[in-house]
Amino acid sequence: GGERRLGELDPLSAAEREELIHTRNATDQAFPEQATLPTLFAEQVARTPQRTALLEADGGTLSYAELDAKVQAVADALRAAGVRTDERVALLVARGPHLLPAILGVQRAGGAYVPINPDHPLERVRLLLEDCGARVVLVDERAATLGESLGETRVLHLERLPQSTGDLPAANVAPGDLAYVIYTSGSTGMPKG
């Protein structure tokens, strides 16, 4: 044959191209349409209760069963505080071992979590709380003093929650329920959620 430019040569056969582009990239999985995060998490706990679920920065670990106990304690405290489906619950929690139990606990209780940076000034925190309508705020020890300055808002300290007794009925969480509200800085400088 005649001369061809290097860019015109195909280094792969049709079968190799099919294998690399289509077969190896066929990673999609059917997702159960009626699944919720609390349901999927509970299924994982049931399958692998002793497996490591959370690695902490200090080297500590939590198994799925241990994480589930913390999640249930958060959910029970929120249900006892009157949190219902789609109700917003603010999280004044730093990134770390308390954040995941807080998120999953809010969702298990049927609420929607609203993460708020605990490093924000008090007035900004108050503005976000007012805007999102959260009646309940979860705080970690780092944000405990900030939580004391929130007036009428019910503040629950994650490190002080009692263990779950299992007395409260589970929330009926549905796929269409609100899961979270995220605030952005907004183009005007006012947060938008």
Task: Please place each PLM-identified region on the residue numbering.
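Carrier-protein-dependent adenylate-forming modules in NRPS/ANL systems
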Residues: G1-R17, R24-G193
